Amino acid sequence: TANYILEEMNVDLPIIQDLRLKEIDYGPDENMVEDHVIKRLGSLYLEKEGMERKDLTEDRMVEIGLSLIAQWNEKAVVPLGWNVDVEKLISGWLDLAASIPDGETWLLVSSNGVMRFSPYILGNYEDFCATHDIKVPTGGVCIFDCVGDHWRCTDWGIKAYKLFK
């Protein structure tokens, strides 16, 4: 993705891979369709709550699964079974933001699962989540800038083509 962006901008800059931006591990839900994920999460949650599989209705599994996905999309609450180290993601964003020299512009490319933790650099994550959809859409762009030692988000999840109109 970074190569493509740099080519389109006709810019020749080095690309540095940073493991802090690597996509999260969705565990058993990796590469699965959303319907399957929703049912699996709902079933797993209900079984954990003591219900037996024979007593689980598909509607109830879907209802709970949708609720768990909504928590992920609205508050970054990691569903059961996903291999996500939230503290590592948060500290990675804080370390990365602190490492960017004043006056430099960086293009960071990552997935929505990782990007949803980037607002921690703002210092007001809960407020940000209350006013933004933290699920970054496919192809979405998030723009941050730093003034002094204070980061701000000027654009969140906008489609790239809208930047070039």
Model feature map: region roles:
Residues 1-59:
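Phosphate-coordination/substrate-recognition cap region in phosphate-metabolizing enzymes
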Residues 42-84:
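Short glycine/proline- and acidic residue-enriched helix-loop micro-motifs
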Residues 17, 101-110, 114:
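Beta-strand elements within well-structured catalytic alpha/beta cores of enzymes
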Residues 75-101:
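A mid-sequence, solvent-exposed acidic-amphipathic segment
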Residues 7, 11, 24-35, 99-105, ...:
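Acidic, low-complexity terminal tails and accessory targeting/binding regions
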